[in-house]
């Protein structure tokens, strides 16, 4: 028994990068850009990677418009109040963007607030743009709540999290643990 425990510990020590990398890679489920009726920038990226990724999809002709989720937040501003000017400052025309202000506090409540608006706009093919670590869970939530829509997911890079190496960065470690907590909670219907 002690020998088996020792061998298991040795295997974990030798294979830890593969195991941890596999757990990180599981969170990332995204594909290459495809044409759609619109891109939807999910809230929660204070660095601008999501909106710039979506704006580039519009510039490259994959989508005619970029819907920007804008939960209310700090100092009476919606996230879209900051995100859209940020993208414009980076050279994208303001005409690309459509604000979707809301008061969501989670990916589920964001989808519940936004999906009726999207359906009302006549959108049938939607590209979700979110951070790499958030792609699997966000895609699953939107597909579950909108089986009538074709949902594709494009990953925006995260400045800290990479699937292979997240354990070397403190911020990425926190991101990994938080996303796994939310993934398990989603599996449990919480």
PLM features: residue spans?
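A structural signal for short, hydrophobic/glycine-enriched beta-strand patches
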Residues: 11-168
């Amino acid at each position: 028994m002690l020998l088996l425990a020792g061998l298991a510990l040795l295997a974990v020590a030798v294979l830890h990068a593969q195991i941890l990398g596999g757990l990180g890679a599981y969170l990332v489920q995204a594909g290459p850009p495809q044409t759609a009726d619109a891109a939807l920038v999910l809230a929660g990226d204070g660095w601008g990677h999501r909106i710039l990724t979506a704006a580039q999809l519009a510039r490259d002709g994959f989508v005619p418009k970029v819907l920007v989720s804008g939960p209310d937040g700090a100092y009476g501003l919606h996230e879209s109040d900051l995100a859209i000017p940020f993208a414009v400052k980076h050279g994208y025309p303001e005409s690309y963007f459509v604000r979707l202000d809301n008061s969501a506090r989670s990916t589920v409540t964001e989808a519940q607030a936004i999906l009726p608006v999207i359906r009302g706009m006549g959108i049938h093919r939607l590209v979700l743009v979110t951070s790499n670590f958030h792609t699997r869970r966000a895609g699953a939530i939107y597909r579950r709540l909108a089986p009538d829509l074709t949902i594709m997911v494009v990953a925006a890079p995260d400045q800290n999290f990479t699937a292979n190496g997240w354990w070397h960065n403190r911020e990425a470690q926190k991101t990994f643990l938080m996303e796994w907590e939310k993934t398990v909670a989603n599996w449990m219907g919480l």
